[in-house]
Amino acid sequence: MKRIIFAVSFLFVSFLVKGQASERNFTYVAATGTGIDMNEPSYTPFMVHVLTYYPISKRFSTGIGTGLSFYEVTLIPLFANAKLAITQPRKFTPFVEFGSGYAFAANKNANGGFHLNSSLGVQYALSEKIKLQLSAGYELQKLERLKKSENDYFTAGFAEKLTHHLLSVKVGIVF
């Protein structure tokens, strides 16, 4: 557990470190959100993600992301992301975004699984370097949790495989 906390802390800190170069190529996003679970058992998750993007062109960027996702268990997703601005950047810029990766479980009684998210959103420019971002989309999260049943005569344990299909809403800041 200490290793996981250290790794996540290292990733968060590395996103905040500024380089010595005067030209800034990377874009950073801090976002939070929730979703409506479309399956049973239903669980309303809470997500906090940080992403970093490298611009391939004026409208297309790729990058990586991580964060915390709170389902039945706490998950630490690590994913690759791609973002396409539908129009040229301006005050309101619509975009489409896609990410795929794996979420690691922070609990020893659970295993993470495949993570996928796609969304459609809009960015609102507050200044040259700071933008607000609002998006809605679909998120898929697979995970496995270990369940235990006990009574006076026996103890049984089994792995429960869960797949969450979410309609998600996220709000974030781009800097």
Ranges and model annotations:
Residues 1-24, 171, 175:
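Bacterial Sec-dependent N-terminal signal peptides
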Residues 28-30, 50-52, 138, 165:
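Polar/charged side chains located within well-ordered beta-strands of beta-rich proteins
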